[in-house]
Amino acid sequence: MGSTHYVADGFPDRIVATPAQDAATGFAVAWRTDASVNQPRLELVVAGNSPGVGTPRRIRASTATLASENGSSHHHRADVDGLHPDTLYAYRVPRTAYRVQGQGQGTWGAWNHFCTAATASTPLTLLYFGDTQNKNLSLVPRVI
């Protein structure tokens, strides 16, 4: 057995958003969970000025299973399209299985944000930094 520190569980981790081929109208989100999450969804809303988010659009994600020395994990990917250019969106992924037998809907993680690119004639700037390895929740938000 590998290090149990890196074992996947029902809480999503390794959440990564990437621009689509047309960064003005789409993006993709990938994340990892344990094998109990078998109907993953992503929720998406236009990020507004109000704490109320309205009714989110739900996007079904695809899932690939990876077997490793730490057991099986599910790697999910949701492709989002049909978005408006130069618009800030909020998205989130489920913390537990979307539907857990006998428990109804699962809970959702925190809202993350993604801004689509402007039109094709506008220069696009990206910020990239590598894997921080440690203190992701306490230090990374300070960079962003």
What are these regions (language model features)?
Residues G109-H113, L137-I144:
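Alpha-helical scaffolding within the catalytic cores
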Residues M1-Y128, Q133:
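Acidic, histidine-bearing metal-coordination/catalytic regions of metal-dependent phosphoesterases
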